[in-house]
């Protein structure tokens, strides 16, 4: 059952007002502050804040201990302080400029990221700003630094925040990639940065698949195979990793790429009845991307669709070493099991 936290950061479905939904955890209702309409009612109360008349002191203590334990994102933040034992005590005393804090909190709320991601981003920003101030250096373009810190924190929590999404959420940002390179060099995060880049595509694929409400076990291996095929097409060499992820997922939904595999048949879903422009717009709204950019990328991919299909077939089947039954073989008398042979590749 849905809770009030599921509506945080969403737009009003009636008047389309941006970030106008106000939640009431006690009444279990969500209302819009712009059109004054109740969006949802009868929602389940948060399990961590609901009143339990049968609760004991042991339950309360267990709840406090659980909140005190670090989560996956906050435990990853320990790698920074472990590299430099003096960094945690020094960075905790650094006071960030309100511009940087407001930018980071705004992006965090619009992107609907977990709270530990914001804490990790603030810790990275304090460590970076504290190091610059200790050497008497200025911190230029503080909003860009805040966005870069939040991007690193989101990738560490396996919820990547691509640059295109960041620019869509805040169009006033500048060269965020340059500030991110400065942060990585300043905090000695080169090894962590390489690991994040290796897992960026897979984590972003899972994030987009879940946003669209699709089956991960079906779309993830298929889209990864499409990513490999897109990398072999020279006409798409200028696309970034995030653009290729977007192209692979939308091709899997619109170009019937699942039927490209031999012996695979799929039924037409509701998205087949819609136009491609509507599918692109729906994905752009859920992924916080600009519709014009998504349309431009997909039009480029559709123009070279035969090349993508040829590269897709050359990539081979997703599951290597697939077995098939030999029709000419007879079942054994002992176990009644047919002899099988491995396909020659």
From Swiss-Prot:
Biased region (Low complexity) positions are: 71-83
The primary site where this protein sits is nucleus
Keyword field:
DNA-binding, Metal-binding, Nucleus, Transcription, Transcription regulation, Zinc, Zinc-finger
According to the record, the residues making up region (Disordered) are 59-89, 318-345
Q: Which CDD domains match?
A: CYCLIN_SF
**Zinc finger TFIIB-type: from-to:** 8-40
- Write one Pfam family the protein is assigned to: TFIIB_C_1
UniProt GO molecular function: RNA polymerase II complex binding; RNA polymerase II general transcription initiation factor activity; RNA polymerase III general transcription initiation factor activity; RNA polymerase III type 3 promoter sequence-specific DNA binding; zinc ion binding
Quote the disruption phenotype from the UniProt entry. Answer: RNAi-mediated knockdown in the procyclic form is lethal. Reduces SLRNA gene transcription. Reduces, to a lesser extent, RNA polymerase II-mediated synthesis of alpha-tubulin and HSP70 mRNAs.
Q: Name one GO cellular component term.
A: transcription factor TFIIIB complex
Q: What is the effect of changing residue 293 to A?
A: Moderate loss of SLRNA gene transcription
Keyword Zinc included in the entry's annotation = yes
| Compartments reported by the entry | Nucleus
Instruction: Give the binding site residues for Zn(2+).
Output: 12, 15, 32, 35
Result after altering residue 268 to A: Moderate loss of SLRNA gene transcription
What's the reported outcome of changing residue 179 to A? Moderate loss of SLRNA gene transcription
**InterPro entries, A to Z:** TFIIB, TFIIB_C_1, TFIIB_C_2
- GO annotation terms (biological process): transcription initiation at RNA polymerase II promoter; transcription preinitiation complex assembly
Quaternary context: Monomer. Interacts with RNA polymerase II subunits RPB1 and RPB2. Interacts with TBP; the interaction is direct.
Q: What does this protein do?
A: Specifically binds to the promoter of the spliced leader (SL) RNA gene and thus is essential for SLRNA transcription.
Q: What family does the database annotate?
A: Belongs to the TFIIB family.
Q: What is this protein called?
A: Transcription initiation factor IIB
């Amino acid at each position: 059952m849905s809770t009030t936290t599921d509506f945080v950061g969403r737009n009003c479905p009636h008047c389309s007002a941006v970030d106008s939904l106000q939640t009431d955890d006690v009444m279990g209702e969500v209302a819009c502050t712009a059109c004054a309409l109740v969006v949802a009612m009868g929602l389940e109360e948060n399990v961590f804040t609901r009143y339990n008349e049968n609760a004991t002191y042991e339950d309360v203590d267990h709840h406090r201990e659980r909140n005190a334990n670090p989560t996956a994102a906050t435990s990853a933040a320990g790698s920074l302080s472990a590299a430099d034992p003096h960094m945690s005590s020094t960075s905790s005393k650094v006071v960030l400029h309100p511009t940087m804090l407001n930018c980071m909190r705004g992006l965090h709320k619009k992107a609907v990221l977990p709270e530990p991601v914001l804490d990790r981003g603030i810790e990275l920003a304090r460590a970076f700003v504290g190091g610059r101030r200790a050497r008497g250096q200025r911190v230029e373009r503080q909003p860009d630094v805040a966005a870069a810190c939040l991007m690193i924190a989101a990738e560490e929590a396996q919820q990547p925040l691509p640059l295109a999404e960041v620019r869509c959420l805040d169009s006033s940002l500048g060269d965020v990639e340059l500030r991110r390179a400065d942060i990585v060099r300043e905090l000695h995060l080169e090894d962590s940065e390489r690991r994040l880049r290796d897992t960026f595509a897979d984590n972003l694929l899972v994030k987009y698949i879940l946003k669209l409400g699709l089956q991960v076990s079906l779309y993830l291996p298929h889209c990864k195979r499409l990513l490999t095929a897109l990398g072999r097409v020279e006409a798409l060499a200028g696309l970034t990793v995030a653009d290729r992820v977007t192209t692979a997922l939308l091709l899997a939904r619109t170009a019937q790429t699942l039927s490209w595999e031999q012996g695979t048949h799929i039924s037409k879903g509701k998205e087949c009845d819609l136009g491609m422009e509507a599918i692109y717009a729906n994905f752009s709204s859920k992924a916080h991307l600009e519709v014009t950019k998504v349309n431009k990328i997909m039009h480029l991919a559709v123009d070279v669709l035969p090349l993508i299909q040829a590269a897709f077939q050359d990539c081979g089947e997703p599951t290597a070493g697939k077995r098939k039954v030999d029709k000419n073989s007879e079942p054994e008398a002992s176990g009644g099991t047919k002899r099988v042979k491995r396909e020659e590749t």
